[in-house]
Amino acid sequence: MSNNLQDILAAASGYQSVTSEPALNRKRPKTLDDYPVIPPASKKVSVISSDLTLHIGFDTEYVFNPETRQNDILSYQSYVVLPDNTGISNIIYPPDSQKKSRLSFKDFLCQTITPLLETGVITKWPGIINIYAHFIRADIASFANFWSDYKILLKGIRGTVSSFKNRYGIDFDEQQERRVKTEQIMFDKRTSPPRCSNVAFIDTLLITPGGMGLAECGELLGLPKLTIPAPYSITNMREYLLGDRAGFEAYALRDAEIAVRYALQVRNFCARELMIDRVPATIGAMAVSRFTKTLKENNMSPEVCLGTHIKTRELWLTEKQAFRTIKNPASVPSRELFETFPINCYHGGRNECFMMGVTPSDHWYDYDLAGAYTTGLLDILTPDYGNIRLSKNPDDYCGHVMGFALVTFRFPESVPYPSLPVRTDQYGLFFPLSGESWATAPEIELALSLGAEMTIHNGIIVPWICDTSPHNSESTSVFLPFVQQVRENRNRHIKGSLEEKFWKEIGNSLYGKLAQGLRAKTAFDTARGLNRSLPPSSVTQPFFAAHVTGFIRAVVGELMNALPSDSSVVSVTTDGFLTNCPLDKINMSGPLSSRFQSLCDIVDPGSSMLTCKHEVSQLIAMKTRGQLTYKAIQGKPVVHARAGVKPPADIPRSDYNDYMVDLYLNRLPGQTLSRSTLISTREMWLSESDLVSREQDIRLNLEFDFKRQPVRPAMNEGHLLMFSRPWDNMEEALQQRSLFDDWRQTHTLKTLADWDDWCDFLYCRTVFSDMKLKVGSKRSDDILVRLFLRALTQCQWGLMLKDKKSYSCKEVAEWLTSEGYSVTVTDVKNAVRAKIPQMKFSSVTPRMKSLMDIIARKYPTFCLPV
């Protein structure tokens, strides 16, 4: 564009042109916007070659090259399943390991399918190609065009690779409820008709119950994953290829076969059991699909139950010169108006550790609520969103009520486990004796029953359309048809079978979809290379999610507070707790527990609301989600929660507990663990890298997390043991947690000496720091020495002029130095000018007491102000 033309345009728009000729000619750096996510629509749409569908499992074998920091590709293998269920395998070797010799994805498919045509196995080019791999992110980057061909990468893969979500950090939520996206690929225009196929990518890892590995999938199919014989190993597949080519090929091809056979089994499951003709991107999406179908099958409107309505808008399509109607669900105004309340009350599970160290020997039971969240969903009837009302009356929140409120509270000191959550940005939930909480109705009811004083500042009550208990009016329970169907189908299949595992996972997954997007989480968007917030799912419902989590927290809290006084609780984790109280002595007659039991009876008549998962005779309590077995009970499963620590690869799983026990008991200040982690998808995208691992040192963090105040320190089995009490308030809790984070940088809490050192550190920073005294790395007796010198030279704190004159500055300095304190003559002389703070000592540390005894021998009248 010339300057004149630019000036004309600028003038027409009302803006002054400021772009110079050199700037116009200068080459502009490219940005992400120069690489379109979806290519411009072609005016001519190619027609796919045929109605033939091929299902292809694929896998790659590679070795990491430390020089290039990339992978050397050894082979590409495929396993094609024909319409008659016949399987045909193929393996392709690149000419060498250089990156330029890699196959493009299109070439891979051509070399896989063309031989089938040439040999007459198929008679026409497939119009639909479904590609399956287990953890597709590891293999898809092995193709030459992974980064350069945006058409295949960012559109074709987005519906599947983007489905890595929670496990791998890519956002897929907006795609999760849609059909798997396909990308039309033209393989050869010269043929007649042209070879054109719709290609879809499916990651089988995302459709496995519990994120099973390929070996577990193979076991369910009766198609075991092959093992690599010694002396070969997975870390150097090149040696395996060179030493045993036949074994290498069998191993590699089996992985591709398992992926596609497993996916087809899931496809059959979806058609037969879920009555859907497609495979959703994840099991969570299956749960959503099944839930909405059960509502309709039972004449229940999803819109009425969820408080949504369909919003339509018209979108003008330029290329078609026509309007397109877009329909999206949206909250009804009455729900949208009050959504802030349940969103603020949605906290997740209660997770606390009540002891630290090696517990006393006893019989410890690990109890879980039976199907906690799935059962808890039955507590929800159909809400009457149009009649939501405000209430500040605590009594309105008692009984079978859906309500949410902002409250201030104080529990009696005698309550061992306060029940109102206080959320912190950095440390999760705390349950102090007093504070401010966003609480659900069940939690408010429990708090009142425990004697809490409470003021409701703002709150809402959401009435039920049919205001009766769910067990008296089962048809009004929103989730009853879904939960019953899950239970019936699980019972129909053999325990441990693929079908039974799928139904169990479907039942457990629905709750997570209700809560999706309620808390700010970011994920990497492969389409733009940027992080963005995860959107809600199609059934995200803050009222339901908050009520269920609050109900479960309240039930667990009621059970723990009803335990006999001689019972102890080691920890609580979401829906269960570790205690030394046998099942027959647990009081389950409270109103909330009784309500939960009645829901259990609906799902499984005669069942108990509590199930015992583990039993041990002695535990190690480290922190939240960190409990180990110190002494097992013969024939009983052990407790083993590692607090996020991943043992080294050479440690067998059966030895994990022993490894963790040794690691905890012998941990050192500042200790790090070497950990191999896969690079993130974001890093793969930005650096155009293969999926490679990175070794990094992770700081060991097994110290107590101070969600409770530690008390009663003692030594047990050679390690410090502490019990705990609830914090009085959040200011005290956060102050001590912050100070402990500082102290543990160079210390561990393993002995009574460590405990004394921590207490001294805490004393200095809570007592002396408030007096504007410079603490630094000093301990309490170091600071008291300085205060004593000031009192001595200024005749304060019980000291008089005769005491000051009893010894020279040099004699005082030498005396204190001989007692282990570094004091110079100058320190003594300068003390006369230093200010003595106005303070009173309500307590002293052991270090201070020892120093006071030393001082008393020379200055018996010296005393601290109280």
UniProtKB/Swiss-Prot annotation:
Residues 50-286 are annotated as: Exonuclease domain. The keyword Manganese applies. Keywords: DNA damage, DNA repair, DNA replication, DNA-binding, DNA-directed DNA polymerase, Exonuclease, Hydrolase, Magnesium, Manganese, Nuclease, Nucleotidyltransferase, Transferase. InterPro entries: DNA/RNA_pol_sf. Changing D368A: No primer-dependent or primer-independent DNA polymerization, loss of translesion DNA synthesis. Residues 287-385 are annotated as: Palm1 domain. Residues 386-481 are annotated as: TPR1 domain. The keyword Coiled coil does not apply. Changing K613A: Strongly reduced primer synthesis, loss of translesion DNA synthesis, normal polymerase activity. Changing R625A: No primer synthesis, impaired polymerase activity. Its EC number is 2.7.7.-, 3.1.11.-, 2.7.7.7. Residues 679-866 are annotated as: Thumb domain. Residues 482-522 are annotated as: Fingers domain. Encoded in a mobile genetic element called pipolin. This is Primer-independent DNA polymerase PolB. It comes from Escherichia coli. The gene is pi-polB.
